């Protein structure tokens, strides 16, 4: 059956994810004026650019909502963020700078918790501000239907009547003023911003042009570390993990993961840690560009990965990274709760994260410039005495190594024979100088 409504359902309850901004304010009032019964739901995700959450439901009621609710989502969002960290569920990176999937994590929490709140009010139609070109329209669709199998979706931005009447920001502002509301359009930024406690995303408008860099962005979770006038003092931070979870910062324990994460954001933000510029593939395979902030996740991830590499063996680390990239892409696609994701999550959280106990000390400087100063854990398999160049207890002898190297002769002989086959087939050319077959250079073809 079709779950997407192309026209406003007159006389029916319609839930809307309400931010209090121009778009959702105009949409809510328009739906009420056209005969629908709008219910407004606002997620408290710890958005750093939101000063008064309690005011948002009051705005919704003023614009015509039948009911307006503020849904507390911060603790759940932090829990999902830490799960992603434990799994390394981050697939977008450029030259070692990571995007921490903060928006996809926010959508997983919003899409499930708001729809669950709607069900409590017997609201089975919902809408939000996502456009047909982006990722969120699919993420919300998936999470919404997973939470409520009877859900129908109405999005004003897919309704041609709404588009014809209120197709732009100017038209929406004029509509609210004509309806008797005082509304003053804010100064248009050169880009759009979406944020939650895990991180911020800046994209669109001027940032669609690759000759516009990070420097046009005004960070909302940290400092503009690239500006010479911004003074940043280096800082040493010690983070402790127990069984994969961060439990203290600089020896201070917190009453909840939310409190700890809030402190990690403050510390990382002082340095502009975790900002990155990424080109990525959207779900529909078209490329987009974003500038990202995630100071707390970046700080915790440095410490977590340091412990992972010191505790686990190479094959485990390799599998953790491969699975993390797979899981990161699934998360990005709105599949965080799908069976294949749960399988990958359970594997990493049980067999990788559970062993991650210890402390890491990091010196933070400007931006993503940092040094790891100390690492300690009872679970470390890094033991310098095993490979020390100084005299001491021998874990293996020269004769042991001779035997090990002799066994390598078997695959070396096989490799040499294969190279000869490739020379005969014309895939490689023989070398009179090195004796080792070489790939042909471009000039040889």
Swiss-Prot record:
One of its GO terms (cellular component) is cytoplasm. CDD domains: ASS (cd01999). ATP binds at residues 17-25, 43, 129, 131, 136, 194. Pathway: Amino-acid biosynthesis; L-arginine biosynthesis; L-arginine from L-ornithine and carbamoyl phosphate: step 2/3. One of its GO terms (molecular function) is argininosuccinate synthase activity. One of its GO terms (biological process) is L-arginine biosynthetic process. L-aspartate binds at residues 131, 135-136. The keyword RNA-binding does not apply. HAMAP family: Arg_succ_synth_type2. Belongs to the argininosuccinate synthase family. Type 2 subfamily. Homotetramer. This is Argininosuccinate synthase. It comes from Gemmatimonas aurantiaca (strain DSM 14586 / JCM 11422 / NBRC 100505 / T-27).
């Amino acid at each position: 059956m079709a779950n997407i409504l192309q026209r406003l359902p007159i006389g029916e309850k319609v839930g809307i994810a309400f931010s209090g901004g121009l778009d959702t304010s105009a949409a809510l009032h328009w739906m009420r004026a056209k005969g629908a019964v709008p219910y407004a739901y606002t997620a408290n995700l710890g958005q750093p650019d939101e000063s008064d959450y309690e005011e948002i439901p009051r705005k919704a009621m003023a614009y015509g909502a039948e009911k307006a609710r503020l849904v507390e989502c911060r603790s759940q969002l932090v829990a999902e963020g830490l799960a992603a960290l434990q799994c390394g569920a981050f697939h977008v990176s450029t030259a070692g700078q990571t995007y921490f999937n903060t928006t996809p994590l926010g959508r997983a929490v919003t899409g499930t918790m708001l729809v669950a709140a709607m069900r409590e009010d017997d609201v089975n139609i919902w809408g939000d501000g996502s456009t047909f070109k982006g990722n969120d329209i699919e993420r919300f669709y998936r999470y919404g239907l997973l939470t409520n199998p009877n859900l129908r979706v109405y999005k004003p931005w897919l309704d041609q009547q709404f588009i014809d009447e209120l197709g732009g920001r100017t038209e929406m502002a004029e509509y609210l003023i004509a309806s008797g509301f005082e509304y003053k359009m804010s100064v248009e930024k050169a880009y759009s911003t979406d944020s939650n406690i895990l991180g911020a995303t800046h994209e669109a408008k001027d940032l669609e042009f690759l000759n516009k860099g990070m420097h046009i962005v005004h960070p909302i979770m940290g400092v503009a570390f690239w500006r010479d006038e911004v003074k940043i003092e280096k800082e040493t931070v010690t983070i402790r993990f127990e069984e994969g979870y961060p439990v203290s910062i600089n020896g201070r324990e917190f009453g909840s993961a939310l409190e700890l994460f809030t402190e990690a954001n403050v510390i990382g933000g002082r340095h502009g840690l975790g900002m990155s510029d990424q080109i990525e593939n959207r779900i529909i395979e078209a490329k987009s560009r974003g500038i990202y902030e995630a100071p707390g996740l970046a700080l915790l991830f440095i410490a977590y990965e340091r412990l992972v590499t010191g505790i686990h063996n190479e094959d485990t680390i390799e599998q953790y990274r491969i699975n993390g990239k797979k899981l990161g892409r699934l998360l990005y696609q709105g599949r965080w709760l799908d069976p294949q994701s749960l399988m990958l999550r359970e594997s990493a959280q049980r067999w990788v994260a559970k062993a991650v106990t210890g402390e890491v000390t990091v010196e933070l400087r400007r931006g993503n410039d940092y040094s790891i100063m100390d690492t300690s854990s009872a679970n470390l398999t890094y033991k310098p005495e095993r490979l020390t160049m100084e005299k001491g207890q021998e874990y293996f002898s020269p004769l042991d190594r001779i035997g090990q190297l002799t066994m390598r002769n078997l695959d070396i002989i096989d490799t040499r024979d294969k190279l000869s086959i490739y020379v005969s087939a014309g895939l490689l050319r023989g070398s009179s100088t090195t004796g080792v077959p070489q790939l042909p250079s471009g000039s040889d073809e």
